[in-house]
Every structure is written in structure tokens, then in C-alpha cells.
């Protein structure tokens, strides 16, 4: 089955803000190329959710109404309605907490 994907602005913003903060903290060693490469990789990984990963129950309370997927260094909260996957939220593994 082929799914269509919708990514909420919240999920994209979480990825961008994480890497923006990394670039501010490590400004002498973290380049703009690294910033854009890491953001693009995290967003590209969102499109692999149902192709490579199994649906899991979330391990954090704020995602209790969603499925959870882990790919690379990111966890994604998503819902499936019909043939549409909606990615609701994203969280880097360093920030996983309730």
C-alpha cells in the first residue's frame, strides 16, 4: 500500500530548532552545510516511517494518542487515517522525556 504523507509545521519546527540550537552552541565546528544536511536527512527519514518501521506504542506520555517510530537519531509521533500518514511531532533522542 502506498501512503501519502502530511508533515505538520510542529514536526518540522522541532527538527529545525534542534539543529539551529546545535549550530549556535558549536558555531566554530558546525557549518551551515552540516545544518542543512542534518535537517534534510531528518525530514527525509520521515518519509520512511511505514516502509521500514513497525508501529510502536509511544514511550512518552505526551504522545499517547499516536504511533511512534524511531529512525536514526529522531523519534516521530504519527497517525494513520486511511492511506494518509500525518507526522504530528518529532523529538531528538537526546530530548526524549515526558
Segments from the language model and where they lie:
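Basic, Lys/Arg-enriched alpha-helical interface segments
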Residues: 1-65
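Enriched for short, Lys/Arg-rich terminal
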Residues: 67-98
Amino acid at each position: 500500500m502506498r501512503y501519502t504523507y502530511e508533515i505538520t509545521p510542529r514536526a518540522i519546527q522541532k527538527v529545525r530548532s534542534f539543529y539551529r540550537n546545535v549550530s549556535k552552541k558549536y558555531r566554530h565546528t558546525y557549518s551551515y552545510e552540516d545544518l542543512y544536511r542534518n535537517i534534510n536527512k531528518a525530514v527525509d527519514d520521515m518519509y520512511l516511517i511505514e516502509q521500514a518501521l513497525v508501529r510502536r506504542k509511544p514511550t512518552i506520555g505526551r504522545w499517547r494518542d499516536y504511533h511512534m517510530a524511531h529512525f536514526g537519531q529522531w523519534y516521530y509521533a504519527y497517525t494513520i487515517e486511511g492511506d494518509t500518514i500525518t507526522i504530528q511531532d518529532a523529538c531528538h533522542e537526546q530530548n526524549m522525556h515526558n
